[in-house]
Amino acid sequence: MTGTESQATAYVTLAADHAHELEIKRSRFIAYLVRTDTEDAARAALAGLRKQHHDARHHCSAFMLGPDRQVQRSNDDGEPSGTAGVPMLEALAKRETPSGKADLSDITAVVVRYFGGVLLGAGGLVRAYSQAVSTALDGAELVRRQRMALFGITSDHADAGRLENELRSGGTTVLGTDYGPTAATLRVALPDGPDIVPAFAERLATLTAGRATALPGGVEWVDMAFGVAP
């Protein structure tokens, strides 16, 4: 693994975009949560909401991107410095997910404010923007994003069905089986990690009496519902 690759093997993100509105002292705070995996996508989401709510006073934003949450940005969009974007970013960063950790990422939060005529003060703004994002997160559907190592296993046609059944019964994700003229290739995915792959290779050798080997096919990030084993 190079220094530019992610150290994380799993994180949590949105299963679907979500929005929620709060009214605080006659100001409307509409919080949008959008799944984004690049800065360009995050800025495009913000631009779209600016256009949609062109008559609003403020369009404050915060986003966290990448499996390691290595990209974090926030913007107050005209609110007093530090009263909007930073509290929104902190609400994303500190949110504990169903994984039991604060590992939310690939998410952009935009809070659109329609000013109601009552000044909230710096403390009131911090609370309002933080609450807007936190309340929206309460109603958002989340999903676990798991890094999977892909492998191809070559087997005789006669053994392929049995091997597939035994792998599935042991909890291995079998993506499919391709039958060629002389052999079958099982495509499998394993949670990526230093201990899992060697253990699988040992299990495969036992199942096939050493006749099959797993050829690496790269890695892929996969959405997985909570409660479903990878």
Language model regions located:
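Glycine- and acidic-rich phosphate- and metal-coordinating loops
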Residues: 64, 104-115
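Short amphipathic alpha-helix segments
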Residues: 154-174, 199
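C-terminal regulatory domains involved in ligand/effector binding and gene-expression control
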Residues: 1-83, 195-230
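Non-DNA-binding regulatory cores of transcription-related proteins
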Residues: 2, 174-190, 197-199, 210
